[in-house]
Amino acid sequence: MKKTVEDRSLEFLIRRRNDAELPPLASLSCKHLKQHHWRDAFDDEQAALREQLWAVKTQLDVIPAETYTATRNKLFPLAASGEQRNFSNRAGHKLLESMESTGVWMELSKLLRGKSTKRPRDFAFADVCGGPGAFSQALFQAGRKRGWRHLHGYGMTLAGVSGLDWYAHLLKSPQFTCTYGLDGTGDIFKLSNIDCLASITKAAPMFLVVADGGFNVDFSVTNYQETISSRIMYGQWLAALKLLRKGGCFVLKLFDTFSPLSRAVLYLSCCMYRRVHVAKPRHSRVVNSERYLVCVDFLGYPSEGWSRYLDSFYEVGFVDNEHVPQLIPREWCLQDAVFMADVRDMNTAVATNQVIALQMILDAAPAMTEELKAKTIEKKPAAGSDDGRTPPPDEGGDGE
C-alpha cells in the first residue's frame, strides 16, 4: 500500500551541545572567502536525501501547471488559497501558526508583562522584506486579540516594485512606519539600508522581527531555490541581529536547509538565541520546501568581533547574486553531534513527507488530466449555438 501524507504542523528543536564553547567567529577573516556558484553550493551532507527529493521534483516537469494545481488542491485542500477571512493570503496564517507551535506568543507575553498584572508594556515589531504586508496585517490582528493595543510596526521592502509595496491601510496607519533605507530603494542587499532601519528603530522596544523575503525562481532551477536565495536569507537574518532587543524573537522563511550556509545560520542562531526551532506550519504546503526558522529569546552578540565579522561577511562575501560564500568552516557544525542530529532529523522528516506528497500528485495526475478534459468538453457550447456566451472560468484556482 502506497504511503500518504497530509498538511499538518511540524516543529523541530535545533540545539547545540551544552558543553560546547562558542565558536571563534571573531578570528575569521573575510579577505579570502571561499565562493561557490549557487549550483555548486551544496556539500555531501544528506546528499542522497536531497537528490531523492530533486529527482521526484524533476518528474513533475512534464505535468501541465493546470493539472498540477488541480491535483494538488484536491489531495491537499489547505494548498488552495482559502480561509482568507482575516488576511489577504495564507502568509499570515503560516506566520501565526509558526509562532504558536514554537511558543513565541507565550515568550512575548512573559516578556511584556513581567510580574505586573497591569496592561502589558508597549512593544514594536519589524517586518523585513515584508511587502505588501501580510505578516504585519496578521500581527496587528493577533496583537488586538491579546490586548496589545500599543503595538507599533516598522517595515522595509523594495520600493517601486509592483505588488511589493505596502498595503494602503498600513501606509495610512499611525501604528506603522515604513522606510526604504538610506538610498530610498528598500534594498536589503545594501548593509546601509539595514543600518538605516536599525537607526530608525533604535529607541523602539523591538521584541519581534519577522522576515518573509524571497523571490520566484524559474521552474527549470527550482531545485536550487535554497542557494539562489542565500543572499536575501542571510541579509534578513543579519537584520534581526541588528534590530532586536535582548529577549526578542525572530521568524524567518527558509527554502530547504541542506546547504552549508543554511546550516551555518542555524548553528550561529543557536549561539545567539536561547531557543531555536524550525517550523513547518499546517498552511505551508507539504508539497514544497518552505519552512520557518523561529528564534526565541535573543541573547545578543557574544562580542563586538562577531558583529564586525557578520557585517563584513555580508558586504564582502556576496559579490553578486550568483555566488554563495562560506560563512564558517563546515567542521564547526559537523563536529557538534547534538546539532547535526537535530538538523538531520528535521531535514529527513520534511523532505520525506514532501517526497511522498509529490509522488501522490504524480500518481493522481493522469486521472486529473482526464477529469479536466471532460470538464472542458462539457463547457463547450452545443453545435449551432449562437448565443455567443463564453463559459465562466473554473473557480478555486490558487491565487498565490
Curated annotation (Swiss-Prot):
GO terms for biological process: 7-methylguanosine mRNA capping; methylation; mRNA modification; mRNA processing. Gene3D superfamilies: 3.40.50.12760. One of its GO terms (molecular function) is mRNA (nucleoside-2'-O-)-methyltransferase activity. S-adenosyl-L-methionine binds at residues 133, 212. It comes from Leishmania major. Residues 373-400 are annotated as: Disordered. This is Cap-specific mRNA (nucleoside-2'-O-)-methyltransferase 1. InterPro entries: mRNA_Cap_2O-Ribose_MeTrfase (IPR050851), RNA_MeTrfase_FtsJ_dom (IPR002877), RrmJ-type_MeTrfase (IPR025816), SAM-dependent_MTases_sf (IPR029063). Its EC number is 2.1.1.57. It catalyses: a 5'-end (N(7)-methyl 5'-triphosphoguanosine)-ribonucleoside in mRNA + S-adenosyl-L-methionine = a 5'-end (N(7)-methyl 5'-triphosphoguanosine)-(2'-O-methyl-ribonucleoside) in mRNA + S-adenosyl-L-homocysteine + H(+). Residues 373-389 have a biased composition (Basic and acidic residues). Keywords: Methyltransferase, mRNA capping, mRNA processing, S-adenosyl-L-methionine, Transferase. The keyword S-adenosyl-L-methionine applies. Pfam families: FtsJ (PF01728). The keyword S-adenosyl-L-methionine applies. Residues 86-299 form the RrmJ-type SAM-dependent 2'-O-MTase domain. The active site is at residue 253. GO terms for cellular component: nucleoplasm; nucleus. S-adenosyl-L-methionine-dependent methyltransferase that mediates RNA cap1 2'-O-ribose methylation to the 5'-cap structure of RNAs. Methylates the ribose of the first nucleotide of a m(7)GpppG-capped mRNA to produce m(7)GpppNmp (cap1).
